[in-house]
């Protein structure tokens, strides 16, 4: 039997011998009767249990990740520093991987001799925010499922799909595009608004120049109001960066040697913990690894 992971990997023509991993594999307008694997979220109690498990995993790994990143960057920062910086991504990533992992584990136990086609490459996000943009994309989830299968001992017969075009598609999806409507909005009212904003922009520019050389924090995942309070408490100048910093993957050299390393060198007894240990460095956003030094000096 063939296993389809998302709507992206619809490689199989014989639908009678096809198992869909979940409802997400089916187009909402498709009326065919597909063989769909059961969902692991059967009730609210199961959701609570999964959340508690993910929190324990997060609590275990945050200190280990802190030690690893300190070592890689020749720093001696506290666990709290790294938790503020990468904690939101780590929590997000553990929850996402655990959800996909449980779906795969259910089908691997229930069905035998499953054949699956996975991506031959990995997709690494440039920034944490990219994960939010991409997590609803089938193409990105296909990479997540593929990485889990590569790094866990499921009883699957594995084929590989050449995935360069999927990488290009996700990169192009993240690049900003000006729609026709936006272009047409450049009129007198728009120019007047821009003119009125000039004094505020100048003041913010001065703040930005000063703050970039004095502030301790950059690109923290928290609301603007909390940013203001934090800077005030630290006697630092609050500013807003209006420009979006875009560093697409195709312009950054991925450090494959470091990303091949594990967070801890010893084998972990808990199977999911061992999976996360294998995946973390290879999937951490570029801003926290290859671009960490660049970002911390801004």
Residues of each region from the PLM?
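Catalytic-core helical/loop segments in enzymes performing group transfer/polymerization on anionic/lipid-linked
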Residues: 1-298
């Amino acid at each position: 039997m063939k296993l389809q992971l998302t709507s992206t990997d619809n490689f199989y023509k014989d639908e009678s011998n096809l198992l869909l991993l979940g409802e997400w594999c089916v187009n909402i307008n498709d009326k065919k009767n597909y063989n769909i694997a059961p969902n692991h979220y059967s009730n609210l109690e199961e959701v609570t249990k999964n959340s508690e498990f993910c929190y324990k995993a997060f609590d275990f790994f945050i200190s280990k990740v802190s030690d690893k990143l300190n070592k890689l960057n020749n720093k001696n920062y506290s666990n709290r520093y790294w938790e503020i910086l990468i904690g939101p991504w780590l929590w997000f990533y553990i929850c996402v991987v655990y959800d996909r992992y449980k779906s795969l584990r259910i089908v691997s136990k229930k069905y035998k001799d499953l054949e699956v086609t996975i991506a031959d490459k990995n997709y690494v996000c440039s920034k944490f925010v990219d994960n939010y943009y991409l997590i609803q994309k089938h193409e990105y989830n296909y990479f997540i499922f593929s990485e889990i299968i590569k790094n866990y001992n499921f009883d699957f017969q594995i084929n590989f799909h050449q995935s360069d075009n999927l990488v290009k598609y996700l990169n192009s999806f993240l690049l900003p595009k000006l729609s026709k409507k936006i272009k047409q909005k450049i009129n007198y009212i728009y120019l007047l608004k821009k003119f009125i904003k000039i004094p505020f922009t100048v003041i913010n520019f001065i703040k930005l120049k000063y703050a970039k050389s004095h502030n301790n924090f950059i690109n923290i995942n928290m609301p603007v109001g909390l940013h203001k309070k934090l800077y005030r408490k630290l006697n630092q100048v609050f500013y807003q960066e209006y420009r979006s910093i875009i560093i697409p993957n195709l312009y950054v050299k991925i450090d494959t040697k470091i990303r091949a390393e594990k967070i801890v060198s010893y084998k972990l007894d808990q199977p999911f913990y061992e999976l996360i240990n294998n995946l973390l460095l290879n999937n951490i956003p570029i801003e926290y690894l290859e671009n960490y030094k660049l970002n911390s000096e801004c």
